């Protein structure tokens, strides 16, 4: 008995004394490593203890033991030290990582950082684009990208490797970067497309003609752009290419392309599963705007996208797509976002269907209260429904992505069901510092308090270990839990730190953690801690320590089904006293199938959800089976609209079968065409047509299909129609509106003025209007009241009247950045003020130009000022300015000549900082320059009309054209006609480069003697941007088949017989143009055939289909016209005479049909349609003959045809389209500006609609050799009657040797340069060029002679060797040739050895040519010395020209041959003059 007591006492003593040892062993092992510089990147290689860490000193470190030991990484050459700027790990290959260097040297590891191999690309990795783009199937394929950006314009150079950078090849230059079609391992999975898309690359490249983002194209190549340099365009929209592609993104099995058009903020998202078939994503009428959407973490069967809804409050709407990414359903309103696009959204890791989001509960009050009240919600059914987070009976709210204080995922990890977050109980989320740590071990169903205060946290050992560190100041300990956060233990750190980062392995299976912190809050000195819980020596979990845990529960607490199955995990019980101890082995889910329910189905293609979500409705009329639907009351069996979600594995037997065919009525199908094509509305209270109507053009990337028209009557009543005039409404009834001002850069917006300080705006296409106050009444001066910012739609400058009742009436300018909510005074005593921000002007976002009277006194002269600080300070450009105009990329200023107060000086700036005086051609003799008109300047040159004659009714001048910077001018066309207001009969053809029509006074001398009544006007056309002008060729017969009063045998124009058209100055409305930007090649006009233009009463209507080369009559008399559906329908109506009939053509004017649009005759004042001419609706404005009341008639042609034309974008014709090439009438080929363009034109017989919102160049076919048409006369030279350029009479020949003085190293100079310069747009190579004779620079005769001479021995061999070789070959052939010279042999077959010596053999033909050439060589000997150096210099020059002319390689794609190629837009004329006048349309008289 005593011995038993002794044994018991001994055991107790042993346990007592051994307890401290056991406690000591229970502590985690903690090691620290000091660093001088902050670690800012840390990442594990998956399924390993290997970590990469990058410090701010650009040193890369690695650890192979979970952070316990560190070593700096270097390559064999020792060049990695302090040169690594970023590190990226391969997303799908766990062995690979990439270190990108700062000096063109980069590194790759393929063995988890053990070894590093260098590769060289002599450029820095891209910053604004992804530097590395990975292939989803083959980890050896990577695209490396660099970028150079000026503002929003970037040049991206891409390189590619297919063998882990053992070899690197250039891919191409682009505007938005390149990506693999297979961007994710799940893309095209199971579609058997491996051979087709394995090497496919997609690139966002510049437009063929405009290097602006709205013209970007998405092209692809399957051979790395080796065979076809530009690639093929991707057909994104209904089988057609789309302009404005911004970027692409790989999202699981989806590939997404984002598109944005000019003139709208709205973006279109196009989605594909195979790169072949693309669909536009439908967000149920919700707008997706640029920089206002975020593609979130998505599933294998749907995408999650959050769309910004309120810029000021930063809230959004969460959408979830169907399985093909085309139709999106709204899940959550008012999601919380930040200004970087981050969204408070996270899917619980490895568990299907559970989502945590934060929303803003006080979103309605955010305009007055900027403090968001954020609440947290959770969904257990993939976002269909949401519920609050709860701690007991209290609501819990957690900080999420927008305020996350650690790396990696916010709430969850692969540890099944264990979720944590920092937050608080209550009605909304508090500041981070006021929150506590909470934990859930049932995937968010229930929560409990874990620790007081905010913490960083991580999960280990599949959730068996949770580690946390306080995030509230300096710490000296860590917290950890082994029971899902119920109880917490503490471990001390060796050094106190401010924690920066806590991390562990990505799969959360390890028991090792890494903590990074700084010694001080300022970041001076750093420690990296390795914390290993493996030292706790707990037992390994066994079978009884696990539970079968259901991942999701329904409202009844039962396991819930999602995608046709229930999901379970074998999970360690929270109170189990064991560790998993299975490093790098991920928890495996267990699935149990369910019977199919409605939740397992989605709407099929071409079906959309009903508003209640219970059925799928046809998105387009159904096509019934053959023989069905003879009557509307018939029925047929057709698709239900449902389909089983792809990837859903529910059990159909015993479940719902929603996708079986159902009985449908024939009312759901295509019906018979509508016969009621016209809709008339008479406005009872309107007696006069004011002419004020405006369309809100819908851009290609805009959703919806309304065609909105705004109209103002003479009685100041404002009307709106959203269906192109079929129905009208008065949204501001009773309010008198004096002006409608559409936003020039944002086609969904407009402003309405009342004449006082109340005004209205709309930004949603006139569906809603908001009132606002302008700071002062509108200006009384002749200038615009509004100026709009090109990039920021809410930035406005208002110019208003001040002190007009006190004798000092003047204008002040105010600015707003929030669409009139707040105004700030900009400048007093102003003239015109404008934003001058342009994409081609770096750092011009805040640049504003203003005219201001000196010393704020209107009696003083005007100054032109600029400021980029909203006039906190400013710069005076001109002290005595008359007016200024902004045209495309140029700012053109007219200032008073200090030597002649009645004369003007023109100055030009491209950058808005430096101005240069315009040098007018010396052959334009205008001693007193009283006025000049700025014409269209969209082709990188300024066109000016310089007034020379001001005789009333016979005003004229010279059209002069500048070089690319707008400073040096040459005469393009003399005696161009203008009117007394300064407007010019000049119009550029839309859609085609370099084509313009102008009217000239052909008998100026007679007019000066006899007066304006004697003037004769002729019409001329240019096809090379003003380089050459010619008369319009006359048609042979009139519209009735009769002869004209004159004719030409060859059909060409002559001085006695040509076609003449009434031009710009005779139009009622400046918007009525000859041509259309979408109806490529078409022009219409009213005029006559003869030796000059006659009155309008004698005019007929003519048309061209080939850009003005040939013309045909279409109707006798004057008609007004409009184009529709990109030219596939043309409507004309008689001008100024009563009618009830209009005429229309569906074949580009070959035939015409009549349509009766009214039962009574009407006098039509205007015929209008969308400015893009892409609508099938037309609107007639006028009045009934016996009434003075305004009436409108809508005519809708859409019912005439049903199908859309089918396009084949492979360079071939299709059934509906052919490729059309513009041409020059003086050239045999189709070269214009040095290249051949190809456009898709609808075949005349094709019975379909274009339905294409934007004109599209198919390709630039090829570059051409240069001809005379690629050159124009240089400064001081003028064109001659034979087309040559000659020095202006009386001017001395330019001293070409001045180049020798400017460059002392020059050896020679061009002694004779015949006055030509290349047209800026041309891309031609080689061919014709002006002859140049070079002479030696003074004192460089010896060098010149040495450069161009040939040595005696060289000359000898150059002559003798070819003759000797030719003679020997000739003798050999002569002795063996079957024919001999002069012999003819008939009927003999030639074969074997003799065939080599037959007459057709190259061996015979070539020596004979050489022998024949001997005589020529001998005759050419005297010229040999001259020709040798000339040919070599010509070769060098040609090579140089080719280098700089190479098209479409970088910035401008179409015009990369010029370094100053910039974004351009078409602008109307602006007149610069001394006298004030009345502005009309969009032109401005200065």
From Swiss-Prot:
One of its GO terms (cellular component) is cytosol. It is found in: Golgi apparatus, trans-Golgi network membrane; Prevacuolar compartment membrane. Glycans are attached at residues 300, 324, 965, 1263. Residues 1-23 form the signal peptide. Its main location: Golgi. Functions as a sorting receptor in the Golgi compartment required for the intracellular sorting and delivery of soluble vacuolar proteins, like carboxypeptidase Y (CPY) and proteinase A. Executes multiple rounds of sorting by cycling between the late Golgi and a prevacuolar endosome-like compartment. Belongs to the VPS10-related sortilin family. This is Vacuolar protein sorting/targeting protein 10. The gene is vps10.
